[in-house]
Structures are given as structure tokens and as C-alpha cells.
């Protein structure tokens, strides 16, 4: 999505001349409780701490342990100190090989970097889909189905990688940052699984998930306005598709949980069978990460 349209800024001056149609964009669903700390780190979007929320046992998730964000490709060296001040010692990159090669993370020396892709995009489907979008051969309904399918497949197609990701995060003894490209889908799913393990209810989990819409709002609205103004360059492109791919919806996370229930019977069974976390280990994690 972030590289869907690459257009020189100088063309912006032509917008008022060639663009006359204004697209109406829907209002996304936002998280209602902004309890998490958001960090303004230049050129890094959706960077926040997962914490300050209560689970079903009344215990509060400790702050300063789990951090999530979008990619770190544009992280500036002068911002390295901010990462260091948070005590982050490890970064987990959830992107696929091509995404990483095109936009590698820029991280401070001394931080451990690991990459685990549960979606390797064989056949370069993302690139092909991008071309179809620009040619107007993908509509909003198609985009919605693609998102639903992606969420379903992410949690079940490569269970060993998902297990590795979760284990790496949960076994960490120091603050850890994990991210994908936009920090909303793959990162959102991983966060939801972590919170499920730690026995947070669905309302809390979904609220945390939807906060990506809150914190990405300025960026997304700017991109949608730009796409609308420059629509004359790609007149066949359905702008509602771009909108659909820019926000997240509860239904997407629903699809992931429904697929887990369908394939494994329950979330608890998935936690034990796929993630390899026993009830004893789960209780230990709850003690470790909450108070």
C-alpha cells in the first residue's frame, strides 16, 4: 500500500487544473480508549507501546515491554537515541523478503534484528495486485475479500513461523519492538495473539487493534487526498480500493479468529497446539507481563 502510488511532488501543482471530481471517503472505526503511549519518532509511523490495559483477571499489562510500529526504513540516526531511551534491545521484522530488500530497517548498533515472515508473497502477488489496482481491475469488494483472506491465512498457513514469532516476543527479557510495513495488519494480528495469551477480553483486544486507525489518521487522510487530487493520472483506479487498504476493520480480525476456531476448535486450543503454550506456561507469561 505504501508504495502503491509513487508520483513526483512537482505534479501536485497540476492538481487543481486536472482534478475536478472529489471522492467521498467513509469514516473508519476508531479505537475508543487511547490508553497507550504514542511516541513521535520522525519518519516512523504508528509507533506505540502496548500497555496500560487490564485483562480479565484484573491485572494490568506492564508498560515499556511491548512496542509496535510501521517499518523503520526511514528512521533517522538522530532518532536512534529515542529508541535507546526506551530500552529496546531487539527488533522483529514481520515483512517478507522483498519488502525488506526494498526498504531495509535502519536501526542503531547493538540492537538485535530478526525477521520472520509468515507471508512470503510467492509469485509476487502484491506487485501484481498493485498493477491491477492502478488499472481499475480491482474494486472495493475485491479488496475487502483480499483483506479477509489475508487475515485468515496469516494465522493458519505457516503455524511454525507464527509460533516462532510469538515465542521470540514472549521469551524476551527486555523491551522488544515488532513491526510490519504499516504496523496495522500483521503487527495487529501478532498483538492480538499476545493479548489473547495474556487473557485480555475481546473488547480490549479490538480496541487496541483499532488504535492504528487513530494514530495513522493524519497519514492516511493525506495520502487519500493526494490520490484523489492525482486521480487523473490513474483514472481507472477505484479510490475506494485505496481507502479499503488504508484502514483496518474489526471484521478483518474477526476473520482471523473465526479461521482459528474453524481449524482448531477454539483460541485456547490454538494457543496450546500451534503456539505450544501450556496452561502452566501461559500463567507464567501472565505473571511476567502483568501486575
Where are these regions (language model features)?
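Cys-dependent protein tyrosine phosphatase-like superfamily
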Residues: 20-176, 190-291
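Gly/Ala-rich beta-loop-alpha elbow adjacent to hydrolase catalytic centers
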Residues: 179
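Ser/Thr-glycine-rich phosphate-binding loops at phosphate-binding pockets of nucleotides
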Residues: 182, 186-187
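Bacterial Sec-dependent N-terminal signal peptides
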Residues: 1-26
Amino acid at each position: 500500500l505504501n508504495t502503491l502510488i509513487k508520483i513526483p511532488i512537482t505534479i501536485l501543482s497540476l492538481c487543481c487544473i486536472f482534478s475536478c471530481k472529489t471522492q467521498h471517503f467513509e469514516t473508519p472505526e476508531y479505537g475508543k480508549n487511547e490508553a497507550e503511549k504514542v511516541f513521535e519518532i520522525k519518519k516512523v509511523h504508528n509507533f506505540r507501546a502496548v500497555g496500560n490495559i487490564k485483562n480479565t483477571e484484573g491485572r494490568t499489562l506492564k508498560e515499556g515491554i511491548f512496542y509496535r510500529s510501521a517499518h523503520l526504513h526511514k528512521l533517522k540516526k538522530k532518532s536512534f537515541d529515542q529508541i535507546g531511551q526506551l530500552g529496546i534491545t531487539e527488533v522483529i521484522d514481520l515483512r517478507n523478503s522483498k519488502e525488506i530488500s526494498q526498504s531495509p530497517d535502519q536501526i542503531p548498533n547493538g540492537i538485535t534484528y530478526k525477521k520472520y515472515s509468515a507471508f512470503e508473497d510467492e509469485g509476487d502477488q502484491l506487485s501484481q495486485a498493485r498493477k491491477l489496482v492502478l488499472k481499475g481491475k480491482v474494486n472495493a469488494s475485491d479488496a475487502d475479500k483480499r483483506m479477509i483472506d489475508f487475515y485468515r491465512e496469516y494465522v493458519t498457513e505457516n503455524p511454525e513461523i507464527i509460533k516462532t514469532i510469538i515465542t521470540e516476543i514472549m521469551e524476551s527479557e527486555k523491551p522488544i519492538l515488532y513491526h510490519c510495513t504499516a504496523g496495522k495488519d500483521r503487527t495487529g494480528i501478532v498483538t492480538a495473539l499476545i493479548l489473547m495469551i495474556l487473557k485480555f477480553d475481546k473488547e480490549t483486544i479490538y480496541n487496541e487493534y483499532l488504535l492504528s486507525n487513530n494514530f495513522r489518521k493524519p497519514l492516511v487522510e493525506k495520502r487519500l487526498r493526494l490520490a484523489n487530487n492525482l486521480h487523473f493520472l490513474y483514472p481507472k483506479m477505484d479510490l475506494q480500493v485505496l481507502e479499503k487498504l488504508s484502514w483496518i476493520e474489526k471484521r478483518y480480525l474477526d476473520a482471523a479468529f473465526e479461521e482459528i476456531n474453524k481449524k482448531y476448535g477454539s483460541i485456547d486450543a490454538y494457543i496450546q497446539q500451534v503456539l505450544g503454550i501450556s496452561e502452566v506456561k501461559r500463567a507464567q507469561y501472565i505473571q511476567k507481563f502483568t501486575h
